Amino acid sequence: MKLANLFQDAMSAIRANNIPESALRLLLADTFGMGLAELNTRLNMDLKDDILTRWNLRLERLLRGEPPQYISGQACFYGLQFKVCPGVLIPRPETEGLVELVLERLHEHQLVLDCCCGSGAIALAIKHMRSDATVHASDLSSEAVTLAKQNAADLMLDISIYECDLFPTTTPGYDLIVCNPPYISDTEYQRLDPSVRDHEPALALRSGNDGLDHMRRLVYQAPSHLTPGGLLCLEHGETQRESIVGMASSQGWKLEYAGADLAGKARYLIFSKPNSHHTTPAVSNQDRSRGYNG
């Protein structure tokens, strides 16, 4: 059997199951050990029975809606290969834009914290590009912390990873805190594509009734973990900007940047640390239990 025939059969199957072609191509490339750009040039390749058996098992999982990154066990982010697994969020392409914004603002030998680090994608991408930076990462999920440590070892990048709720308690002030927190509301969560809702961890996606529980904690608590003039860099939901800017302004944060992702959706905010202290609202135990993402 040739790859072209397999591809045609698989295309028919995914169309019948409303699976995007991009997911199929990702899984094909990984299964047959080639880059995405190679697929169209290797369609005449003959396939052996053992690889066909492996492919058929993988295709069954894809047709059940499982993300191709979980099937292959890896995802590409900022040109690096990361291990991924169910229980830890798959890094998204739009988050690469957040990394770019951090790199543009990072001075030499600064101390950076990536809250809600998940697989470690943001923290490790920053360290890969800026070896002079001291990078810390944190996550409430022990599974995420274990995976992030594996990725750091595989990529031979030296970062410190903490299992904690947002902020490590034993570290000095950070020059920059970056976070892609959970920001899906309860209502939005029910409308998510089943490939996300049924397979990726709810703990990494949901953030209370309005999707802003984590944002509130970051806005209220981050100042005590930043150096004077320190930056808070956030990824957020496309309808949340006004609410986040409003709560940040009420706490004295200075808005330094507001930007969109490559699809033109409002996605990024950067604030500088308030000059004065504001009252921090109490955080419930329920809120404290949600500090996890990828």
Where on the chain are the PLM-derived regions?
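Short, intrinsically disordered C-terminal tails of secreted or membrane-associated proteins
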Residues: S289-R290
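Mobile active-site "lid"/loop adjacent to the S-adenosyl-L-methionine
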Residues: Y183-H214
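Residue-level signal for inorganic ion chemistry
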Residues: L27, G65, T95, I122, ...
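Conserved SAM/SAH cofactor-binding pocket of Class I
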Residues: E94-R191
